[in-house]
């Protein structure tokens, strides 16, 4: 919760060594998402690049997050979101493939790409065993 009592949904996607084949998504699926994109979305407009992963995956995640926020759920009300993608700095290919995504957003501050070490730094001293486990597990 923020200082002004807003509840923030934080979808986190962890990527390490993923690569994508850049296959175009199925047309019926593309059409479904294009039709649901409206002026309330943080996505400015549909562009052809969104029809290929990894951008297609990011669009779907963003739209799902927005759907949750707009659902006005009484049990789990959410006011806003920050979409976090955890990608090692060494995965240059994936980082370069998604670097255009924030440019297609009305508010690019809602999309963050962060290295796992940087994300885990706040727990390093307090949860040393967890930090060491994650460091070892995802070092490769």
Predicted region positions:
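Basic, amphipathic N-terminal segments that precede the first structured/catalytic domain
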Residues: 1-3, 139-140
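Active-site beta-strand-loop-beta-strand hairpin of nuclease catalytic cores
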Residues: 2-11, 19, 66
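Extended hydrophobic secondary-structure segments that form protein cores and membrane-embedded regions
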Residues: 12-13, 81-89
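Short, solvent-exposed loop/turn segments at secondary-structure junctions
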Residues: 16-19, 89-92
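Acidic, metal/cofactor-coordinating or nucleic-acid-engaging core segments within structured domains
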Residues: 21-83
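A short acidic (Asp/Glu
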Residues: 22-24, 65, 92-100
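Polybasic (Lys/Arg-rich)
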Residues: 88, 95-140
């Amino acid at each position: 919760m923020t200082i002004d009592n807003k509840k923030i949904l934080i979808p986190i996607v962890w990527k390490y060594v993923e690569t994508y084949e850049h296959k175009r998504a199925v047309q019926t699926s593309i059409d479904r998402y294009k039709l649901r994109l409206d002026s309330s979305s943080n996505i400015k407009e549909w562009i052809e690049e969104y029809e290929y992963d990894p951008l297609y995956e990011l669009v779907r995640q963003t739209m799902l997050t927005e759907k949750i926020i707009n659902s006005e759920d009484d049990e789990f009300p959410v006011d806003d979101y920050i979409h976090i993608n955890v990608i090692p700095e060494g995965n240059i290919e994936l980082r370069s493939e998604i670097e255009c995504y924030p440019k297609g957003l009305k508010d690019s501050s809602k999309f963050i790409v962060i290295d796992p070490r940087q994300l885990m730094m706040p727990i390093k001293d307090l949860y040393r065993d967890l930090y060491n486990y994650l460091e070892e597990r995802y070092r490769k």
